[in-house]
Each structure stands twice: as C-alpha cells, then as structure tokens.
C-alpha cells in the first residue's frame, strides 16, 4: 500500500465513497483525457505490468473484480418467507386466542381442556405455508441449476523486480486489479474498465451497452494513417461510449488486438455501478399490488363481520364464552388461508408448463404478470432482430443489381489479413456459391490498407494473374468514399463524378438509409503493374472510380412479426424502446408490423415533464436513441397510466428496465446482468412462446381468481346464514369445531384448482387484479347460498323437529352436510360462466377431489369423529330433501350467474 500514490487512491476510491458525491464520476472517464504514460503514472503502474506482490496488495485494497448480483436466499429464509403472509398472521392470532379460551383458561379453572380447534388451525397454517415453500424452493433450485458456471480468465503481464522479466499469465478475471496490464484479442470480453496502451485494428462491440449493432473502432492514441497529432485528446463533450481510447467492462472484441491498463474493477466500473444500482429491493409488480389489495379487502371484511357475529350470539344466547368461540371459528372460515398456496401452486404449474417450451421462469409471480400484461416494451437489437448483419443488395450506381460489384466486394473482404468485421463476414457469407472458383484463383492479393476510424475505408491491392493488371479495391462509408472519388461507372462507361451525379448517388444512398439499411460504396483504381513488391499508401486512395453500393441489414427474427401480431390479437400492445438510431429502427418495426408514426427520441424524452411523457407514451409505439434511464422512465410512465408492462431485452443497457417492468423477459444469449434482472428467460429464439406465456399467465390468474371468488362469496354466504340463524335460533347453528372441520375440508377440495382449465372466452384479453370486482362478486353471489342454508334451517326445524337445545346436534349435523356440500358444489357452479358439467366440465383432478370431499362430508356425522365433535347420524329421509335442495341451488345459482354477467358484463 505504501507504494501507491495519493492520486491513485483518489482515482480508485471505493464505490461507497463515490456514491456519497452528488455526481457519479467513473475513474475510466478521467483517463480518456490523459496520455497513456500519465494514466500509468496515476495508477503507479508500468507498461510491463505489476509484480505479483503489487497485484496481491491491491487485491486486498480494492477487492475482487466482481459486480453485485442477486443471491437466492437459504432454504431456512425461504421457509420463513413462505409463512410471511397476512392471512397466516390472522390464523396464528386466532390459534393463540383459541389456545387461551380452549386450553389455558379451562386448565386454570380445573375444567376439561380441548386443543382440537388449535390443532385444526395450525394444520391449515402448516398446509398453506409448507406447500408454498416446497413449490418456490423447487423452482428456485431449478433456476439455479440452469445458470451456467463459466470461469473466465484474462491475460496479464507480470514483471519481476527492477522492471525486468515480464511474462504473460492467465488469471481469473476476478483477480484483476487497477494497474494490471491486460491483452485483448478477437473474441475476448473486456474484463474491466481499461485505458488502451497500444492497439491494432481494434473493434469493440458495444451493442450490449448501447443497442448499436455495429462495432466501433478503438485506438490507443489519435495518431494513425490520417496523420493526426498523437497528443490530440478526445472531445470532452463526448459520451462515455464514444470515447475512443477506453473500453468498458462487459463489451467484447470483434477484431484486432490491444494492450491496455486496468483503471477500474468491480463496482467502480460503469458496468459494476449499473449492476449495483439494480440489485436490491425490486419495485412492486402489478401482481404484488393486486394480491395485497385483495388480501386487505378480505381482512377488512372479516374484521367487520366477526364482531357482529359475536355481539348477536352473545346477546341472544347469553353465553359469551361460547359466542366468542363461535366468532373465532367464523373468523377462521372467513380467512382464505390457502390463498398463498393456491397462488404458488398455480404459478409453479405455469412455470413447469413453460419449461417444456424451453422457457425458464425465475420468479413465479411473473407468470400471472405475463397474463395481465397489456403493453410489451421490447428492445430491437438481438430481440426483434437476429443481431447479425446480412448483405441485402449489391448494386451499380444506377441501383441495378450487379455481379461485378459483388465480385469486387468479395475480393476486398476475402483479401484482408486481420480479423474481419461483421460487414466483411456478411459479404463472404453471401458470396459463398455465387463467386466462381475461377475468380478466386485468378486474383492475387499484393497489399492492403486496413480500416481505421478516421478514414472509414479499407483498401486491398489485387493482381490479375492472367493479365498482370493491378487494381486497388476500396470499400467504405459513403461520405469518406465520395471525398476520394473522381469518377463513377455507368454501365460500361466510366464518367466524371460531377456535382449532379454526386447528388443523385447521395440521394440513392440516403433512400436506402431511410429504409434502415447501412450503405457502403465500392470503388476501384488501376495502379502501375511494375515492381515485384508493390505497397499501398493512403495517397493511393485518390482518383477512385465508384463502382456501386452495398446495403446491409440486421433482419428481424422469423418469428418476430407473427409473435407481435399474436400479442396484438390477445390485447397486448407492443412498443419498441431502443438505443439504436430512428431510421434503422423504423425499418425493422415496419417489417414486423409495428406503427412507426412519429418516433420519439431520447433527446425529446429528456426534455419532457413526467405529465407530458405520460401522455406521449400512449400515442407512440417506437422510441429510439434511448439511454437505460430513459427506458426505465418510459416504463414507469406506462405503469402510472395503469398498464401492466412487460419488457423484452438482452443487453446491459436493458437491465434497469428489465428490473422495473412488471415482467422482465430476456434470452439465453443475453448479458449476464440482463438475465439476472429478468423474470423470464427464453432459451430459444422463437418469439411465439411469448403468446403462449400470455395465455398461460391468464390461465394461472383465472384459477387464482376462481379460488378467491369462490371462497369470498361462499364465506360471505355462510356468515349471512350464521347471522340469520343466530338471530332466530336459541342455540348455535353450528359449533366452532364444526366450522373448523368444514373449512379444513373445503380447503383440501381447493388444492386441485391449479390443475383446472379456463374457458377460451376468459383468455382473450389481459386480466388484472381488482379488489372491487371481488367485493362485488362476494356481495351479489354470496347470499345465493344463504337462501338454501335458510331452507335447510327450516327443514331441520319444522320437518325433523330439531327445534330445541336437546335436538341441536341433529340440527347442526343437517346444516354441516348441506353447508359443506353446497360450498364444495360451488366450485363447479362458479368456475365457469357457462353451464357446468354440460358446456364446461372441470378437469379430472377437480372432479375427483370435490367428489371425495363431498363423500367424506356425508360420512362424518355417521363416524366416530362425528360423535367426538357433537354430530349425530341423520335419518335417511333427510337425503332426498338434501338432493332437492342442492339441485335447486344449482338452478338458482345458474340463473344468478346469467343475471350477474348481463348486469356487469363479465363473470370474473
């Protein structure tokens, strides 16, 4: 540590110190404006690297070269989280009250104690929490197993004492420290934020950061073949990505090689800072907000109804202890304690179904958010497009397809000795099978001038083996090629490049640009054939004859257009949020069927207030030249407008948006930070799986909402029945233990709901949580069952003479069976808006589970358990009345269902 100067400490102060400052300054940014020697001095390093001792000491100071990432909590924490639910808290409180009233107080008075109620409530708690834990634990474990464990290394220089004996070593990138000198070559990931010391034909792909599909050239100094001053420094107004003498962590080398010094590692890099900012507490998704609102609606309802039941029974019966126990049982009955388990089971089932389509669901609630999603925002490069440049046209200056232009382009690309860029590779792929073998053998490469950032051209000198003619073939950007051209070829004639012809050619290239194509010009010049060792210089790139043009495109994925159309048919609007330029973006969007009217750019977004942006995001479908924060701002504007928003992206620059979306979707080839920030990962490029995810999400939501509507309406009906019975009957219509057993059995019957199916009509549009709808459903549908509960009361009171305290067991047994059977039958009545069993049948698991529970319910009064809890066998004459009551209930419920749909326009 003693050998590290003060400047170095300032440069690489821990990220926590930088965070305290108002403006985020990255160490690498400052080094772009210093010479290589100044940077080495500030880092107290050397062109031959660090010694082993120096590297070891700095590793202790700065820590490992790792960025923040999420960790799956230990199993114990997951177990505790499974019980972290308001309904569980309510049940635990009720279990505590039951323990005091049924066990502790009687024990103190020397009376008989009873823990049955406590055990039943704790069974419900355990069943709900443990099943939820098991489902989520299995899903987390599967997601972790699918993460690739790749150990990446970097090549560094390690010098001996006295700056001698430097050797190259391969070390894990986690062990890199500021001051290390690293080597970069084609195919390498840039392992840290680095300042270039030396480079040759170095091209870096920054698409993962910027969304721009074309690589950019990087260089150690501004001196190059164009003759720039080596001390000239970059423009300070440039963005971090535009600085040519630095490379950022997470980008990759597409061609060339370089030597660079590490300036920042870990969380002090640009990439690390972004990773740190997105790891932590996630914003609440639409799913979370919906579950919370529904949960508190039901809890508020319970808090209102339970005191009413207590007061009515207490005053009418005079036994406040018994009334308290009964009110306690009613509270348990009103608590949908299986909601967390039903939710988890439904989500896990959806995740398993999606995994068969090679889709990994990392966060279970993303399944439901998928179904609720009504806006999908997507990046362009690598998601809608193939992230692979293709040659589309090879044309002469008149815009006519030309085999000569293709041949010249192929000779230029195939004759380059360095690593070829994406456009050269596209030309070579296109030329396979189109360039005759005789052509390949006929021309011999003699020399080349590599591409560089200033000239923006690449030239090769080839010799015709048949005639000995030598020809310079130059390929490059339109403006730079126009600067060195004096002629162009029109058919078989070579004519002067007049101002008129120049304008016509520029108009053609601009027209292709407007269609989203990248355009290069190809030109030639005949050179003197004398000399055995011909060489090229920049001076030779003059008086060129333009032969034609090449157009390139990163085409959309085959499934993109179909997927977007399918999403639109299912009520999901698609918006494109990209860092790429508007022209290229518009072309791709048109091809896949997205409206490109009035594209909004990042500059325009930045100038808007939140209110203005909230209005504009509803009108526009395409947003270009966006920064990561601008993408997030657009997402948040859509969410504030009430939309459930998904985001599909694969780059580092997409990570914040992926994290803030209600459902973040990425692909397997995405950056690690993008995959970590996402909720769902597509393992294959077929985007049609998005439609399947939407349908599966709606099916999952439907089965969850079934449970809530059934439970809420059924419980409300029961409470209404209890209030009526309590007001007119001199004894409790059902004991607390009866209600607890009934509720437990009903809960068990609900366990099969995740395996039920939804009607096709339900799946046609996005579905969202709405506590008001559930409350309305409860108030309208719940009392329907009360009609037949009251009918049963009258039946037991008048027909079977269970109208006094001595006959209360018979009365309670009759309502126990009718209540359980009607509550279980309601599963089939309410699961569909159609006629149950005829137009829409439940799945086999639901039929078996509900049938079994109904059979057990009928048997209980005849069993030893029934005798233990105060029930008694019913006469056979009761059952024809029961069948008639249940059939009447089905008919009335179906009629009420039709009225409700006509009145409110929907069922769920």
From Swiss-Prot:
Gene: mgtB
NCBIfam families on file: ATPase-IIIB_Mg (TIGR01524), ATPase_P-type (TIGR01494), PRK15122.1 (NF011702)
GO cellular component: intracellular membrane-bounded organelle; plasma membrane
Transmembrane portions of the chain: 81-101, 114-134, 294-314, 324-341, 705-724, 734-753, 776-799, 809-827, 841-860, 876-895
Protein name listed in UniProt: Magnesium-transporting ATPase, P-type 1
Stretches in topological domain Extracellular: 102-113, 315-323, 725-733, 800-808, 861-875
Species of the source: Salmonella typhimurium (strain LT2 / SGSC1412 / ATCC 700720)
Function recorded in the entry: Mediates magnesium influx to the cytosol.
Membrane topology, as annotated: Multi-pass membrane protein
Enzyme Commission no: 7.2.2.14
